[in-house]
């Protein structure tokens, strides 16, 4: 039994070829059409010298071509690299180099950034460009239009051998703020993230054809995953749908009103989103629509699933008031663990509390000695996942050794999330021990933002922390020690750091202090920085930012 992602998708394609696989705007692809285009792409990549295990970047928003790309890359035996479309040139350069990327598929709107990066990343020899209505010049670096390039190649499924040991790469942020490539065997990521385990029972799917048999036996469920495909959770929702013959509705840009229209028009059954950052706009849009005397037909919708960031109980309750008899879930997990636990709320059930979840049998909470925390003890432990876990980080043995550790003969993935185990066995999440900031589901690492801030001529030292935000959960706050005689403004810092880091990492509030506190060894005192933001109001808050507490 070869539990390879390409094989699993092909089983469903063979089972329901005429069923609609993808919808984006006015476009639709059946499973057979998806297969044909993905095969052509795979053959094109191979013709360009892409070999087994070579890395191919996908630099697109959620649209049909990104799914063709995902499937075509794994069919070719290559490894896809998820490229965050918010990245600026320095971040792209690092990712291209770190991944050893040899080919890139990108939307035309990113041509200027690509043009600036490619001269410094010579391994990237092949560039396919997806038309998106923009007019940026991509011929200057040898880019070719996506569909015209693949049209000349075979639509047949005649590829080399595959294995459950083939590698699937998920790039995520690292401790320095730069991305880390998490290497998964296909079988392992299938088991914990792509549907190879029954999430209701915790039991593994027995046979590689079981999911495609479900496709034949059941009508399609319509899924709308809103977060960008750069997130493992959205890749998860998409692959699970493709393995089981369901339909995925794609939204290139998050628009809350458009999301409800899509649910209405396409009879969406499952909605996936990222915590309060998306839940609040969705709720506001729905309320505004109802206040205007309009009604969407949302009778098809039965599940609202939050991934990547837990969303607040108050919003869950409001959703249940507006949409009774629906199921609300939020899930914990990471690129290093896959799904680890879920909190479920439905009408008539009691909420399980804030960030409190029921963990699966392979997720543990360990104390500092590697022993399981006793329920109800009040001891803080660290979340650890065993069983199907990654091989490690790509080209980073040090980080691999730190994150993937063995206790009592069992190898665990330990990305750094702390928790307590309640008396009933449920787990209350306490947060990432590494002081990362979670803003709308995006993990932001302080060191990278601090480095950008300290490049400003008026900044002597700086720390950044997360502060509460009604919409995004947290936003980035800067605690800055100015150079003598200087007083940088938030607007000046904003303009400066945007050339170094993506916009979602830019500080939204500013505290000016006489001295940034550090240890004698120069290590940052984040507790002091956090206390500073809690003890007094910010000196400045971004004029266009709402929702800060």
Predicted regions: what they are:
Residues 87, 93-96, 104-106, 261, ...:
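AMP-binding/adenylate-forming catalytic core of the ANL superfamily
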């Amino acid at each position: 039994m070869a539990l390879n992602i390409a094989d699993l998708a092909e089983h469903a394609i063979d089972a329901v070829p005429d069923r609609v696989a993808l919808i984006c705007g006015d476009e639709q692809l059946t499973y057979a059409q998806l297969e044909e285009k993905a095969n052509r792409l795979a053959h094109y990549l191979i013709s360009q010298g892409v070999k087994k295990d070579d890395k191919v970047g996908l630099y697109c928003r959620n649209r049909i071509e990104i799914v063709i790309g995902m499937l075509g890359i794994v069919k070719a035996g290559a490894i896809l690299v998820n490229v965050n479309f918010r990245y600026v040139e320095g971040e792209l350069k690092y990712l291209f180099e770190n991944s050893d990327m040899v080919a890139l598929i990108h939307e035309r709107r990113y041509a200027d950034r690509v043009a600036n990066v490619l001269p410094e990343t010579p391994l990237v020899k092949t560039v396919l460009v997806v038309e998106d209505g923009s007019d940026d010049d991509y011929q200057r670096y040898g880019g070719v239009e996506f569909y015209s390039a693949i049209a000349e190649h075979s639509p047949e499924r005649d590829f080399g051998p595959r294995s459950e040991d083939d590698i699937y790469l998920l790039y995520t942020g690292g401790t320095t703020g730069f991305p880390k490539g998490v290497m998964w065997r296909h079988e392992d990521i299938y088991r914990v993230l792509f549907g190879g385990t029954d999430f209701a029972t915790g039991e593994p799917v027995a046979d590689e054809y079981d999911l495609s048999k479900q496709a034949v036996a059941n009508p399609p469920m319509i899924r709308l995953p809103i977060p960008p495909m750069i997130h493992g959770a959205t890749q998860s929702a998409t692959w699970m749908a493709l393995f089981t013959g369901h339909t995925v509705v794609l939204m290139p840009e998050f628009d809350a009103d458009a999301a409800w229209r899509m649910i209405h028009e396409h009879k969406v059954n499952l909605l996936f989103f990222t915590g309060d950052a998306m839940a609040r706009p969705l709720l506001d849009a729905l309320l505004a629509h109802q206040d205007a005397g309009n009604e969407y037909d949302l009778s098809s919708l039965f599940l609202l699933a939050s991934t990547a960031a837990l969303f607040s109980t108050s919003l869950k309750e409001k959703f249940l008031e507006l949409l009774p008899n629906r199921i609300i879930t939020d899930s914990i997990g990471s690129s290093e663990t896959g799904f680890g636990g879920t909190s479920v709320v439905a009408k008539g059930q009691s909420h399980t509390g804030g960030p409190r979840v029921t963990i699966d049998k392979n997720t543990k909470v360990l104390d500092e000695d590697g022993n399981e925390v006793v329920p109800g003890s009040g001891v803080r432990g660290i979340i650890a996942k065993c069983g199907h876990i990654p091989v490690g980080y790509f080209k980073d043995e040090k980080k691999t050794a730190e994150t993937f550790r063995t206790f009592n003969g069992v190898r665990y993935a330990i990305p750094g999330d702390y928790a307590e185990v309640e008396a009933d066995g449920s787990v209350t999440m306490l947060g990432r021990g590494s002081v990362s900031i979670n803003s709308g589901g995006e993990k932001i690492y302080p060191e990278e933002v601090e480095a950008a801030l300290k490049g400003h001529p008026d900044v002597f030292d700086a720390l950044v922390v997360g502060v509460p935000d009604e919409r995004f959960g947290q936003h980035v706050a800067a605690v800055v020690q100015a150079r003598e005689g200087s007083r940088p403004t938030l607007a000046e810092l904003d303009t400066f750091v945007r050339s170094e880091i993506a916009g979602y990492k830019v500080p939204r509030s500013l505290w000016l202090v006489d001295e940034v506190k550090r240890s004698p060894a120069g290590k940052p005192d984040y507790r002091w920085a956090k206390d500073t933001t809690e003890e007094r109001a910010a000196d400045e808050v971004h004029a266009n930012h709402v929702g800060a507490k």
